[in-house]
């Protein structure tokens, strides 16, 4: 028998079906990483995706120089319209909210990258950077900023500012090398710990649980990344 379930809801329809089953069987469940509000979990533990996008823009645009005519690039997933990409869309919404407030005349490009076809990505990026030499600032809203960072390194190119999400090994290596300038960490270990604790408090100790517990939005650079992992 199952008393409680901790879920990272990456897939909309599957998550809704699981949530309906758990509700019918009176089994408590909590979400980490992404909140799917209509599934009515006991609690959500993770970042505010919209705010993290807003902050990402604010950090990235510190590198902006209007006098150089710099242009901004949104590197988006080819699955961006998939319901599983809702978290990325919320980050994008927050990011663009800050840009709209502060940089009305900024030239913005969108480049679609394929999750699994690096050869196609290379061709896309080669053509884009040849056509847009002033594209100096970039953002990736998922964990695959390494795709872009590795391309820049191998192509002998660089950007004035590049920000992405998640502390995958490949991302961290590129942060340390300077090919990626910022990573936003989400403390997945702490999310899991808080999720289990909330379920235990509810199921075992009959305590009330907050419906939302937001994690800090951590900005990592090459100078502080080595001090971070002990506390993730």
PLM segments and residue spans:
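Hydrophobic alpha-helical segments within soluble ligand-binding/sensing domains
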Residues: 45-71, 171, 186-204
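Non-catalytic structural scaffold of enzyme domains
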Residues: 12, 17, 40, 61, ...
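Hydrophobic alpha-helical
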Residues: 3-23, 109-171
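Hinge/beta->alpha junction and helix N-cap segments in small-molecule ligand-binding domains
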Residues: 46-54, 76-94, 106-123, 140-144, ...
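Hinge/cleft segment of the Venus flytrap/periplasmic-binding protein
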Residues: 83-84, 99, 187-232
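Conserved phosphoryl-transfer motifs of two-component systems
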Residues: 43, 181-182
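Flexible loop/hinge segments that line or gate small-molecule binding clefts
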Residues: 17-51, 168-176
């Amino acid at each position: 028998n199952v008393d409680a379930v901790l879920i990272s809801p990456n897939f909309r329809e599957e998550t809704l079906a699981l949530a309906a089953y758990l509700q019918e069987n009176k089994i408590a469940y909590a979400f980490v990483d992404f909140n799917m509000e209509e599934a009515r979990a006991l609690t959500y533990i993770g970042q505010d995706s919209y705010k993290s996008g807003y902050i990402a823009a604010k950090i990235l645009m510190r590198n902006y120089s209007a006098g150089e005519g710099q242009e901004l690039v949104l590197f988006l997933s080819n699955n961006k319209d998939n319901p599983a990409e809702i978290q990325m869309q919320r980050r994008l919404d927050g990011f663009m909210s800050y840009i709209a407030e502060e940089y009305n005349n900024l030239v913005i490009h969108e480049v679609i990258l394929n999750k699994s076809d690096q050869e196609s990505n290379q061709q896309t990026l080669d053509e884009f950077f040849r056509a847009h030499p002033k594209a100096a600032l970039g953002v990736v809203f998922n964990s695959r900023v390494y795709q872009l960072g590795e391309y820049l390194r191998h192509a002998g190119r660089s950007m004035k500012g590049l920000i992405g999400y998640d502390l995958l090994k490949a991302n961290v290596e590129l942060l340390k090398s300077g090919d990626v300038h910022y990573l936003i960490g989400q403390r997945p270990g702490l999310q899991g710990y808080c999720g289990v604790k909330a379920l235990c408090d509810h199921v075992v100790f009959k305590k009330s649980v907050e419906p939302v517990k937001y994690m800090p939005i951590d900005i990592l650079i090459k100078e502080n990344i080595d001090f971070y992992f002990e506390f993730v």
